[in-house]
């Protein structure tokens, strides 16, 4: 159950618009932008907790979200198989691009600590981090949103 949910979480997100066919998991609008900005800010303030967890893991499925820009479009991607060294995260792009063409699923990507827009990991069936998902819950059917809310370690 955790793996399919993780794939769903890793697929969800965001920003800007374009005319091409987009993956159905790409969320371009409909969420509260101020709530999303606050979620990203909270994630960045708490990223040292994630780095500590990554260096001494008590959970699994560690991931970091990175904004990637190409031709004026910005899309957020989850990186998996994360490492952190010299103030940089490195990982594998975990979802298909929908708006940018300078990256592909399975590609290695590196980003500075301050560039991360979110982070997450699982422990004992609970999800830590993934703050950027919370503003998206209002857009989901209530049953689906309730399932995700029950998985969050923090409200």
Provide a role label for each language-model segment:
Residues 17-78, 83-155:
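Mixed-charge, low-complexity intrinsically disordered regions
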Residues 1-4:
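Positively charged n-region of N-terminal signal peptides that target proteins for export
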Residues 7-16:
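Bacterial N-terminal signal peptides
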